Each structure stands twice: as C-alpha cells, then as structure tokens.
Amino acid sequence: MLPSVISYDKRGVIPVIVSRMMRILLATILLVLLTTASAASERLPLFQDESIIKAVLTAPIAQAYAQRDQDVRLYMPGQWVYADADGENHRLDVSIRTRGLFRREYCDLSPLQLNFKKKQVKDTLFDGQNKLKVVAPCKHGAQWQQKVVLEYLAYRTLQILTDTSFSTRLVRLSYVDSDESMEPWTDLVFVIEDDDDMADRLGLVKLGVVANQFNQLDRPATALAELFQLLIANNDYSVLQGPEGDECCHNSEILAPKGNADSRIPVPFDFDLSGLVNAKYAAPPSSIPIRFVRTRYYRGLCHPPGVLEDAMAQVQSKRAEIMALYASTPLLEPRTKASTYRYIEEFFELLDDPKRVQKEIVGRCRGEDELAEMLSRD
C-alpha cells in the first residue's frame, strides 16, 4: 500500500487521500518542463538588460492614430533612433500602426506596434526583432505615466515567478510626428517580447486553438498563472476560451511542449484592467460579485490535490524578491510606491492565513465537477 497524505476538498471538510507518488510525479513533470525551458535558448539581446533605452520615433504618428477605428490599418514608415550603452546613436527603419482593442479605441495615445526589418537589425541591440508591441500612457499626464510603470511591474513580477512569461524592456521614447501635425513629446514606455520569440526561447510551440478543455491544461503552470492574476487582482482573462470569434484565450497566450498539445500552458499578458494598475477606465467583470477593481477575487480553476498548494509555495518562495521589486523601484512616485507596496504585501498576508486561503481561494475555484470527472478517468 502506497503511503499517503491528507488534503481537503474545496469545502475543507471531506478528506481526500492523495498518494505521495502522484505528487512526486507532478513535481517531476514540472521540473522537466522548467529544465527544458531553461535549456532552450537565451533571450534576444533587447531583453538581456533591464536598463532604460533612450529612443526617438519619427513617423506620421497622427496618421497612424487616425486609423484607430479601422479594422484594417496600414503600417506607416518611419525612423527609430536609439542610443546604445556607449551613447552612440543607431538609426533603423521602422513601420508603425495602432494595435490593441479597448485601448486602441479609448486612449488618446493609442498603443503602437513597431515593425522592424529583420535584415537591418542584424548585429544591433534589436537583432532578431521584427514586430514589437509598445505599451505607453493612455493619455498625457503624470498619472497615466505611473499606470505604465505599474503594468511594467506586473510583467516583471510574473518574470520573477516563472521564465514562462513575456520579456519586457523600458524605453524613454520621444515621439516626433513627421507631418508636424502633433507637438513632440516624451514618455516612459515598454516593449513586449514577440509571442513566437517567447515560444522559441522556451522550447515550446504556440497553439492556435479555439478553446481549451479542462483536462488539457498543464495544472502546475495554470495554478501559478492564476495565483499571479490574484496577486495583481486581474480578472480580465481566461485560460479556457477567447472572446467570441477569436482564438483562445483571452489575454492568455497558450503554449505547449512539442508533440504534446494536451499539456497546455497559459502565459498571462495585458494587465491594464488589474487592480494593481487601477486605471480610471477599469471595472470588474459583471459576472463576479465585487464592486471595485482593487478587490481581489479568485477566479482560478479547481486543481488536483497538492497542485494549488505547490503553486502557493512557489509564490511564497519568491516573496522577498517580489517585495524588493516594489520597494526598490525608482519609477513610482512616493505615495504610489508606498500604497503599491502595501497592496502586494496584502496578497502575501492572504497566503499566510490558512482560513482565508480555504475561503477566498480554494472555496472559490471553478470547475469542481469537471475536476472530479477528470480525476475519475485517471
């Protein structure tokens, strides 16, 4: 007879016997995935450093913004000049167009996508780059600038938790409209690693699927992603499906090991509607019983016994590093920095309290019946 440990179902009252062998097997699978990822390849040069790049974008920016309401938007040709670590300027051709969904239509300064020429960027800081998403302030003003910093810190938090995350790089970007229809301005923005590049770096493949079935998800990776979403109080995501008519999944890129499409790994992105960022336009989904976006509400799936506990232990193991990220950043104004630090601290206080974990995390998991069916087939 195999030795066993006792854990509990979501109500905390029914004992569930879980073999240690199963937990060891799950941990071994996760270790293999992480080892494969770490051995896959290095990050491209742009994402090997955390220093802020200084750059100037000269392009018909006003024309690009004028297309924001169009489904088909043309790339506008321009120039990208950046300074390297030695202060030497480098000029690259670039094309731009607006991107995104909500922010593209709502924001005065719609997000841009950069399109570089692969041959031209060879042997530069942008070597290997083709298309890059830019996350920038929604509107002019210091308050909107702080929102960009907070979203950048959300990405950095996920990078601390797992390599299975999008790389980012800050840019002090000056915008110059080549038609002189807009006055020049400068903002702190960040660029995000291309999804195909991320998959290649991790030695995984990107899946273009309509939806994920409950039993197709990599449980440890999914549980970790869902705890991260709780940490930043983000409910604007799904690991099961995308918006109607779109590929899976909403604000989650789906990756899988080569040859194993039934071990799907969700990679979160797009955090402007999170409580951490707390943008003026953010509001909780009407489907969950909270009024304020800053209120944390767990929307994760139910997982086999031990999976969520292991994910919480992994998050706790990164606690000091995460808190140091928010304590040491020079990019936040003092009041915002203090309130943000406290907000992150409150998440770890939740994890420290077993009764709250049972009530606010385990007790709110979704798909209990689907989990029972999945376990009955194993």
For every predicted segment, state its role.
Residues V5, D9, V13-V18:
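Acidic, Ala/Val/Gly-enriched low-complexity intrinsically disordered segments
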Residues L25-T35:
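Bacterial N-terminal signal peptides
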Residues M21, L30, D196:
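Short, flexible active-site-adjacent loop segments at beta-strand->alpha-helix junctions, enriched
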Residues I6-S7, T35-A39:
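Intrinsic disorder/low-complexity segments in short proteins, especially the signal peptide
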Residues A40-D378:
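Phosphate/dinucleotide-binding and metal-coordinating scaffold of catalytic cores
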Residues V18-I24:
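Positively charged n-region of N-terminal signal peptides that target proteins for export
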